[in-house]
From Swiss-Prot:
GO molecular function, one term: aldehyde-lyase activity
Listed NCBIfam families: fsa_talC_mipB
Single GO cellular component term: cytoplasm
The enzyme's E.C. designation: 2.2.1.2
Function, as annotated: Transaldolase is important for the balance of metabolites in the pentose-phosphate pathway.
Originating gene: tal
Entry-linked InterPro entries: Aldolase_TIM, TAL/FSA, Transaldolase_3B, Transaldolase_3B/F6P_aldolase, Transaldolase_AS, TSA/FSA_arc/bac
The protein, known as: Probable transaldolase
Family annotation (SUPFAM superfamilies): Aldolase
Localization, UniProt: Cytoplasm
GO biological process: carbohydrate metabolic process; pentose-phosphate shunt
Catalytic activity line of the entry: D-sedoheptulose 7-phosphate + D-glyceraldehyde 3-phosphate = D-erythrose 4-phosphate + beta-D-fructose 6-phosphate
Keywords: Cytoplasm, Pentose shunt, Schiff base, Transferase
Chief localisation class: cytoplasm
Length: 223
């Protein structure tokens, strides 16, 4: 399963890359607006992310009409070969996805909340579908259940559209996505850090270092 970072923060992206754990990045206008300010402009941030990330980088359109979405998508696509255009799951969005698919521009259908929406996006030619599991949890549903259902539907019909699990809130979401067989999970940097940490790991490391001081009182490596 691929891991994308859901952020527009350059420092977070660079640290994730240094860890060897970042296969791509997803952004949205909210995330980018948090970083845009002072000398940094919206487009500059997008260009910088596209430059430092080898994998796919999702950048969202803001138009609500298909013609506007397509126009914005072409501009996003021109910024880099790894740019993926995020298109909302609406009737106008589906029209745009179909058109962009015909132009070989990769798309990520966002704001998906049920399996049928995912199927429709795939039929329109979306490269990725992004079901928002955390937001479904917020209203009392089991967000990960729809990932399981989407996976079953896509397997039934050998659909190549990739399942990109979004709105991830915790490591359990990541675990369940991996067990189900989702193609990608996009996570905040804070969740990435939680995946690495475990109290027993910290406890074991502390014990090893304490025991090492019995061999080398100053703690230095002596080989």
């Amino acid at each position: 399963m691929k891991i994308f970072l859901d952020t527009a923060n350059i420092s977070e992206i660079k640290e994730g890359i240094d860890l060897g754990l970042v296969d791509g990045v997803t952004t949205n206008p909210t995330l980018i607006s948090k970083e845009a300010g002072g000398s940094k402009k919206y487009a500059e941030i997008i260009k910088e992310i596209l430059k430092i990330v080898d994998g796919p980088v999702s950048v969202e359109v803001v138009s609500t009409k298909s013609d506007g979405m397509v126009e914005e998508a072409r501009k996003i696509h021109a910024l880099g070969d790894n740019a993926v255009v995020k298109i909302p799951m609406t009737d106008e969005g589906l029209k745009a996805i179909r058109k962009l698919s015909q132009e070989n521009i990769e798309t990520n259908c966002t704001l998906v909340f049920n399996p049928i929406q995912a199927l429709l996006a795939a039929k329109s030619g979306a490269t990725y579908v992004s079901p928002f599991v955390g937001r479904l949890d917020d209203i009392g549903q089991d967000g990960m259940q729809i990932i399981d259902e989407i996976k079953t539907i896509f397997n039934n019909y050998i659909i190549k559209t990739q399942i990109l699990v979004a709105s991830v809130r915790n490591p359990i979401h990541v675990l369940r996505a991996a067990i189900i067989g989702a193609d990608v999970v996009t996570i905040p940097f804070s969740v990435l850090k939680l995946l690495i940490k475990h109290p027993k790991t910290d406890e074991g490391l502390t014990r090893f270092l304490e025991d090492w001081k019995k061999v080398s009182p100053d703690g230095k490596f002596i080989i």
